[in-house]
Design a protein with these regions (language model features):
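Pyridoxal 5′-phosphate
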Residues: 1-341
């Protein structure tokens, strides 16, 4: 066996073609170069590549938002650094938004990174990434957790978002298998990161003991072996592309808005998140009176309806995240079951 599987030319060429093709597909979706796409196991992998790869000193600081309102994967890796650097947390409102002036006031000459989720896993709020990048003005490295946006809010263009790094998942909105993820690393910005995992794919030895990292994507590609998952993600993403990402956005927002309208007819129901549909994904978080979210999840599962229990400020709530395969009839069936509670 070698890094691409069995020692077979046919197998090696097949896997290499899959690797090359998925990078081209993702590069087209986010408007970058194929070599800037690193294959990972999850969004979390990409976040940790950045958190563990940047160089800091004792005067350094990074800026995050939300703390307990943030997804753990885009919170814990930064908090782990708190004994080495200053972690500056932006105050937020009930929907997870922060004031841009607060971001400006927290930036100084020692700010090494701003790390922000593009959209929030609990409220569905879409943060103003382009306004944030304009403030940073290519002077401060910018990391975006796009796990909740790639595949559900239409076309992306990293050149407009002006981010240095972006991580997202293959098994959420891209509908691929578990264990698939993508990490975008701007070619020039790759010089800011030192890999913390090294293997034969990522480096070479010169002059007997001088370790030289390879160029992108190999520099960060150590140990990836989920070729079966990769083939599945290639198929799922191709289907989404054929449907059209903007068409998908239109469809799922119709479902989301339908649910909000219908659940609003239940007196004890409450919906969380922005009212303006341009400020949110199709995610809808809600509660139905004092009913236990865990019990509701179980009751609906018995009816063949899958919803999730999540948290907003450590408060348990229910969440739906309709996607392209869902229908209006399914939304109406969900609401009818909620009325029976």
């Amino acid at each position: 066996y070698n890094s691409l599987g069995p020692d077979s030319k046919d197998s090696e060429l097949f896997v290499a073609e899959k690797l090359d093709n998925i990078r081209k597909i993702i590069a087209k979706i986010i408007c970058c170069k194929p070599e800037e796409v690193i294959l990972t196991q999850s969004t979390t992998d990409g976040i940790n590549i950045v958190a563990n790869g940047l160089s800091f000193d004792n005067t350094s600081n990074i800026i995050i938002r939300g703390m307990t309102h943030e997804h753990h994967s885009n919170f814990y890796p930064w908090i782990k650094l708190k004994d080495r650097i200053s972690i500056r947390n932006l105050p937020i409102d009930d929907n997870g938004f922060f004031e841009l002036d607060d971001l400006k006031s927290n930036i100084d000459n020692n700010t090494k990174l701003v790390a922000i989720s593009h959209a929030l896993y609990n409220t569905g709020s879409i943060l103003p990434i382009e306004k944030i990048s304009k403030i940073l003005d290519n002077e401060i490295p910018f990391f975006i957790d796009s796990a909740q946006t790639i595949g559900c809010i239409g076309e992306h263009d990293v050149s407009k978002l002006k981010c240095n790094f972006m991580s997202f998942n293959g098994s959420k909105w891209l509908c691929g298998p578990m264990g698939t993820g993508l990490f975008y690393c701007n070619r020039k910005s790759s010089e800011l990161l030192e890999p913390k995992t090294i293997g034969g794919e990522s480096a070479i030895i010169k002059n007997d003991n001088d370790l030289i990292f390879k160029d992108l994507p190999d520099k960060f590609q150590t140990g990836f072996r989920n070729y079966v998952g990769l083939a599945g993600m290639e198929s799922s993403v191709t289907i989404l592309q054929n449907l059209g990402l903007d068409n998908i956005r239109k469809h799922i927002m119709e479902l989301s808005n339908l649910f909000i309208d219908e659940i609003g007819k239940i007196p004890e129901a409450r919906v969380f998140g922005p009212e303006n549909e341009n400020e949110r994904t199709s995610i809808v978080s809600f509660e139905v009176g004092k009913n236990d979210p865990e019990k509701i999840v179980s009751a609906l599962a018995e009816k063949g309806i899958i919803v999730a229990k999540r948290e907003i400020y450590e408060k348990p709530i229910l969440r739906i995240s309709p996607h392209v395969f869902n229908t209006k009839d399914e939304i109406l069936k969900l609401v009818e079951e909620l009325k029976k509670l």
